[in-house]
């Protein structure tokens, strides 16, 4: 059985190894007798994915961010800002707050900064950093905001503990995540369900968790936060919302699933005909007699003051 080396870890010739080879963006860290995965983004870093993220942000502004606003003068850390898809909304809705947005990808940060400049915003600074090695002193920020990041981490609980330490007492940590297991649609399709499961499995293979939305409450409590509140944010689409059918079903969710086609086939999770049938059936739910439903989860916790 042929093996390959990824960093310091030898990976056997399995679908996991093939998926790792294909993505070429996975790095490993030894942690005792096991390993964790860092810097693994199952959707990839390419222009179409950046466009999908922008479409997603635009479609979900009201649903996810209507109740997100920070007081004048507050300093907010946005972790994992990516291409700035959420950053612009945050900065617009809290024009007198100061944002420091960080990401590990220099290319993503460059695009995010360009988006901020194009929007004429001046209350955002950017910094390149690893989530698990953030170069900031404890209690440096009034608030921390994290959106669609935990699902890609092999150690989400550790990350939340880091974010909590960076908060000042009485500061808030806001986390937004999806949950692919919440997806339901009509017409029903086993092929579409299997295509979605390919994405869930691939994300698990590289250390992430596409079902993490349902876990936000216990994760935030375990991080030591108080007064934790989690609210489901459901996207429901039928023929009465053709704008959302295009923006969310087609350009956001189905585009996300379709984007892992090559990885899923290479990893042995499906074949091209089955996967393509599933994607077609997902697009089919955007037609006049189709229905689509998906749930995001938004959690907010407060850092307690010292006893």
Range-by-range predicted roles:
Residues 157-172:
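A short glycine-rich, Lys/Arg-flanked "PGG" loop and its adjoining helix->strand segment in the class I
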Residues 77, 83-133:
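Class I SAM-dependent methyltransferase SAM/SAH-binding core
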Residues 38-58:
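Class I SAM-dependent methyltransferase Rossmann-like catalytic core
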């Amino acid at each position: 059985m042929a093996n390959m080396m990824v960093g310091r870890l030898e990976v056997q010739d399995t679908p996991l190894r093939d998926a790792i080879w294909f993505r070429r963006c996975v790095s490993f860290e030894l942690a005792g007798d096991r390993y964790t995965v860092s810097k693994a983004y199952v959707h990839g870093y390419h222009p179409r994915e950046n466009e999908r993220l922008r479409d997603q942000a635009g479609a979900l502004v009201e649903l996810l961010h209507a109740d997100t606003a920070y007081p004048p003068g507050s300093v907010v850390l946005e972790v994992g800002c990516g291409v700035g898809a959420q950053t612009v909304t945050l900065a617009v809705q809290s024009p007198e707050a100061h944002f420091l947005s960080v990401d590990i990808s220099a290319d993503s940060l460059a695009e995010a900064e360009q988006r901020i400049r194009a929007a004429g915003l001046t209350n955002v600074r950017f910094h390149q950093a690893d989530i698990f090695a953030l170069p900031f002193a404890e209690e440096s920020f009034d608030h921390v905001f994290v959106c669609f990041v935990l699902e890609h981490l092999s150690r989400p609980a550790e990350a939340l503990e880091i974010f909590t330490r960076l908060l000042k007492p009485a500061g808030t940590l806001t986390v937004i995540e999806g949950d692919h297991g919440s997806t339901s649609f009509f017409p029903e399709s086993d092929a579409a369900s299997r295509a979605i499961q390919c994405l869930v499995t691939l994300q698990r293979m590289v250390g992430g968790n596409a079902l993490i939305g349902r876990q936000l409450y216990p994760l935030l409590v375990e991080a030591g936060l108080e007064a934790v509140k989690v609210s489901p944010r459901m996207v429901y689409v039928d023929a009465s919302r053709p704008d959302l059918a295009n923006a969310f079903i087609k350009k956001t969710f189905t585009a996300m699933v379709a984007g892992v086609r090559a990885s899923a086939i290479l990893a042995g999770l499906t074949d091209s005909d089955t996967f393509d049938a599933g994607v077609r059936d997902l697009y089919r739910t955007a037609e006049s007699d189709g229905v689509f439903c998906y749930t995001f989860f938004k959690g907010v916790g407060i850092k307690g003051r010292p006893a």
